[in-house]
UniProtKB/Swiss-Prot annotation:
Identification of the protein by name: Adenine phosphoribosyltransferase
GO cellular component: cytoplasm
Protein species of origin: Neisseria gonorrhoeae (strain ATCC 700825 / FA 1090)
Quaternary structure, from the entry: Homodimer.
Domain of life: Bacteria
Family: Belongs to the purine/pyrimidine phosphoribosyltransferase family.
Localization, UniProt: Cytoplasm
Length: 188
């Protein structure tokens, strides 16, 4: 049973996100979504808000980014009655993969997807928990494109607007939807 999104406000989700100062390093204000996931009421609200947005958009598959994108994406795929594809950190998938690297503050990382995960022409929704610089989301979008998928939208719970990730994603040609926007994760 879906909870109608108007039954609770999106602001209620924002209130449920825990803020932790100086984690994982000094100067960062970490936004922890686990309280949303731990609450049946708020987790349902989160998923239902996304279901209502995408239920009429003819999604073929939901892809989720490692790791919290798995939780949200799998629940959303289930409700939309479509398959789920994990996009994992490099070296975590057992079958043949396609890889895409992205820049970190100090260095580089990569994500991978199975080569048979997205069929050419499939309409794909990419999901993660948040958008900061956009590097991971951009890498995921590129993987979907490499396999011939059509990006319906990239979606997240939270976007840190001052870090320009959303702007970078939109500049890549992908639409982006976030439930919440915040000025940033830098403590100051």
């Amino acid at each position: 049973m879906l909870v109608h999104p108007e039954a609770m406000s999106v602001g209620a989700l924002a209130d449920k996100i825990r803020k932790i100062e100086n984690w994982p390093q000094k100067g960062i204000l970490f936004h922890d979504i686990t309280p949303v996931l731990q609450s049946a009421e708020y987790f349902r609200l989160l998923v239902d808000l996304l279901v209502y947005r995408y239920m009429d958009q003819k999604i073929d598959i939901v892809a989720g980014l490692d790791a919290r994108g798995f939780i949200i994406g799998a629940a959303l795929a289930y409700q939309l009655n479509v398959g789920f594809v994990p996009i994992r950190k490099k070296g975590k998938l057992p079958f043949e993969t396609v890889s895409q690297s992205y820049a970190l503050e100090y260095g580089e990382a990569a994500v991978e997807i199975h080569t048979d995960a997205v069929k050419p022409g499939s309409r794909v929704l990419l999901v993660d928990d948040l958008v900061a610089t956009g590097g991971t989301m951009l890498a995921g979008l590129e993987l979907i494109r490499k396999l011939g998928g059509e990006i319906v939208e990239a979606a997240a719970i939270l976007e840190f607007t001052d870090l320009q990730g959303g702007k970078n994603i939109r500049a890549s040609g992908a639409p982006l939807f976030t439930l919440l926007q915040n000025e940033g994760c830098m403590k100051g």
